[in-house]
């Protein structure tokens, strides 16, 4: 039986070998007919080969430059750093992390300061190529960039994402600089720059277009790094895919926070990791014009206390068309809202050259450059400010009042996508109002009362939860900062023309009764008779101003002035011109009497217990005709 089984066993082995070879051949045919898609490494390498190193971006296939800032407690709440020392006090080995964890706090209590910070570097994960192909394109054909793209409506964040996804990541912008700018040759020895881009769920193509625009237009010798700060984005594409993409771009680093910091906190985080001489804070939906960086660095190299910004051109959110802006200055109003103001014809003629730097009261928040050490030594951003609103006002006031200056440079141009007004990602109104209160309490000195008069709800909120600005006021004294009246007199006098500035302000006290002028009406106060009431710091209605125009302004959102009807003092709309203007003129005498200029009579409080209204009477100097304001403003403060 054994001789019969052996041939059967040999045939079985031969059949198995033939079957194995057949399967191998089938597999090879399948691979040849259906090759796998190129890897990310191959795709990016092929893309890079289309561009020269001088004009394009270079790639580095080393380790991913990604840092994750970790805290044990997770959450989407906005939070600045508990226990994190002020930026000015950080040492080089402490500029690592922006979110402190409970474990770190326990370490700090043991006496080692560095233990308050965790710094974790993660290897990047494999990216999602299907999502990548779905949400962005990398066409770089110049002709395709001229294709007419159909505008669509805005997404929830106010951007036309479908149109943006169809637009090439790299496109040539129209030349909008003045011809003299093209004759400028950057000098050698300019400082290096760290460009900090903070984002939260930014559209993928918009973010990458900003990154490549910087890489393509900034000289490599001057660009120290681009630091991307992910402020807890939730989009999947901004996680693993972005990590892999950034890993292959030279001089681009990615920082992630696992707690929502807001724009101010995220910019602070990027600043702590930056190594360039100059910090350039830029929104993550910009495109840079060639030659945008050199003028910024040149002006800062000449004076490290300068805070500078490019001309901000407009990229339409509907069509993504790039439009040049005329020369503007950044200004503000008494509600502490930022305003663009066109440079007038006379102001342009006063410039030494069409490309001369423009002094600006306020720097725009879209793109701003500042020397890194100057930023540190002047306290960086105010840690009390939340999210991202009004930080440009704080930086501008600090620069002007503490020995620096603010400029907009015509030869530096950067386009910015201004989101649709229907965007749902605006800052919380109450948070924005709190930021304004902090700035008013910190920088406006006595002029904060004017701010509160324009926003009564801010006055009410400040009484409920007044911010503790002690540390910032100490910083002002340490830096030897000027007061806000210097800003009004020397930087932006248009905000407060001399004849509108108060000679006296605050509560108007009647010497005879020890009470204050007030309006007791509810609702509409137009025509309200003025009366006496117990003095209170919590009543905005008692905050008055006597101006250089001899008006007595009422402390409310409306511009109302003391007027006279039938011998009684009432509130009426302030008159700017015409004969009726004299009806609202009051002369405040040194002896305390307030004389109505048109009639020559004095303002007097009623002496009856049931009637404390204000009337006009013949001047006789009795105590019911004597008044005083809380504050007197010398001429040099007006």
Swiss-Prot record:
Chain segments carrying region Catalytic subdomain A: 190-299
TM annotation in the entry: 13-35
Primary location class: Golgi
Ranges for domain Ricin B-type lectin: 503-630
Tissue: Specifically expressed in testis.
List of glycosylated residues: 573
SUPFAM superfamilies associated with the record: Nucleotide-diphospho-sugar transferases, Ricin B-like lectins
Pathway of action: Protein modification; protein glycosylation
GO terms of biological process kind: protein glycosylation
Its membrane topology: Single-pass type II membrane protein
Molecular function in Gene Ontology: carbohydrate binding; metal ion binding; polypeptide N-acetylgalactosaminyltransferase activity
Reactions listed under catalytic activity: L-seryl-[protein] + UDP-N-acetyl-alpha-D-galactosamine = a 3-O-[N-acetyl-alpha-D-galactosaminyl]-L-seryl-[protein] + UDP + H(+); L-threonyl-[protein] + UDP-N-acetyl-alpha-D-galactosamine = a 3-O-[N-acetyl-alpha-D-galactosaminyl]-L-threonyl-[protein] + UDP + H(+)
GO cellular component, one term: transport vesicle
Catalytic class of the enzyme: transferase
Keywords: Disulfide bond, Glycoprotein, Glycosyltransferase, Golgi apparatus, Lectin, Manganese, Membrane, Metal-binding, Signal-anchor, Transferase, Transmembrane, Transmembrane helix
Residues given in the record as substrate binding sites: 231, 260, 419
Cofactor(s) the protein requires to work: Mn(2+)
Cytoplasmic side: 1-12
UniProt-listed SMART domains: RICIN
Residue segments, region Catalytic subdomain B: 357-419
Region (Disordered): 134-157
Domain remarks in the Swiss-Prot or TrEMBL record: There are two conserved domains in the glycosyltransferase region: the N-terminal domain (domain A, also called GT1 motif), which is probably involved in manganese coordination and substrate binding and the C-terminal domain (domain B, also called Gal/GalNAc-T motif), which is probably involved in catalytic reaction and UDP-Gal binding.
Family assignment from sequence similarity: Belongs to the glycosyltransferase 2 family. GalNAc-T subfamily.
Protein name from the UniProt record: Polypeptide N-acetylgalactosaminyltransferase 15
Originating organism: Mus musculus (Mouse)
Gene name per UniProt: Galnt15
